[in-house]
C-alpha cells in the first residue's frame, strides 16, 4: 500500500500566492492618486473596449490589475451590491469601506477555500468625500487583505518601480495637471527602458467632488488628456470634452454626457461566473452581510 501524498497547508498557501502574484505581474500598472479636487485613476491601457477603471456608484470607483475576465466579474458584483444596498436603504449608505470589505471577504474565501485556482487580481476601491479629508481609498489583494490608500497607490506588475518614482514626485493636494504628469512619467518608468506614454495609450478617470451631479465619476477623453499633459491630440477638435461613464452596463462602459439624475439600476445576467455566487454567499438577498 502506497503512502498518501501529503502537502502541508503552508506550502499550499505559498504555491497559491506565488501563482496569483505571477499572474498579476503580467498586468499593466494602474495608479490611484489623491489630488486637490478628488481622486484620479491613471492606467496604461491602449484598449478602448476593455476598461481597467470603472464607476461603481455615485461617489465610488474601481480600478484593477491582473486577469481581465476575473476583475470584470468582481466589478459587476460590486455594482450589483451597491445598487441593491442603495435601493434597500439609502444612496448615502453605499460606502467604499463596505464595498472593500465585501471584496476582501469574497477574495479571501476563494483564495483559502476555493478548489480551483486563486484569482489573479489586485483591486482598488475609492470614494470621494465632501472635503479632501473625507476621501477614502482601499487596496484589496488577491488573498483578501485590505490596506488604506494614503496619498497614492499603484497596482499591477510594475507597482514597486512605479511607486518608487511617484514617491519622489508626488505632492499632496496638488492640481490635476501636476498629478497627471507625475503619474504618466512614473508609469513610463516601470523598470524597463524609460518610455513616453501617449494619450491614446492611457486610460484616465477622476472622482471629482466639485461636480454638481450626484455621480462624481468622469472619464478624461483622449483630447482633454492631451491638453492636460501639454501634448498635441491625435484627432478631434477643441470642442470635444470629457466623457461620462455608464458604469451600470455589464460590459464595456458607455459614454453619456450631461446626466443630472442617477440612472436606475440595471439587471445583471445570472451567469456572470462563480464570483457572483461567492459574493452572494457573503451577502444576504438585501445586499447586507449575513449573520454568522
From Swiss-Prot:
Residues 282-292 have a biased composition (Acidic residues). It is found in: Cytoplasm. GO terms for cellular component: cytoplasm; proteasome core complex, alpha-subunit complex. GO terms for biological process: modification-dependent protein catabolic process; proteasomal protein catabolic process. One of its GO terms (molecular function) is threonine-type endopeptidase activity. The formation of the proteasomal ATPase ARC-20S proteasome complex, likely via the docking of the C-termini of ARC into the intersubunit pockets in the alpha-rings, may trigger opening of the gate for substrate entry. Interconversion between the open-gate and close-gate conformations leads to a dynamic regulation of the 20S proteasome proteolysis activity. Keywords: Cytoplasm, Proteasome. Residues 234-292 are annotated as: Disordered. Pathway: Protein degradation; proteasomal Pup-dependent pathway. PROSITE patterns: PROTEASOME_ALPHA_2. InterPro entries: Ntn_hydrolases_N, Proteasome_alpha-type, Proteasome_asu_bac, Proteasome_sua/b. Pfam families: Proteasome (PF00227). The keyword Cytoplasm applies. HAMAP family: Proteasome_A_B (MF_00289_B). Belongs to the peptidase T1A family. Component of the proteasome core, a large protease complex with broad specificity involved in protein degradation. The 20S proteasome core is composed of 14 alpha and 14 beta subunits that assemble into four stacked heptameric rings, resulting in a barrel-shaped structure. The two inner rings, each composed of seven catalytic beta subunits, are sandwiched by two outer rings, each composed of seven alpha subunits. The catalytic chamber with the active sites is on the inside of the barrel. Has a gated structure, the ends of the cylinder being occluded by the N-termini of the alpha-subunits. Is capped by the proteasome-associated ATPase, ARC. This is Proteasome subunit alpha. It comes from Catenulispora acidiphila (strain DSM 44928 / JCM 14897 / NBRC 102108 / NRRL B-24433 / ID139908).
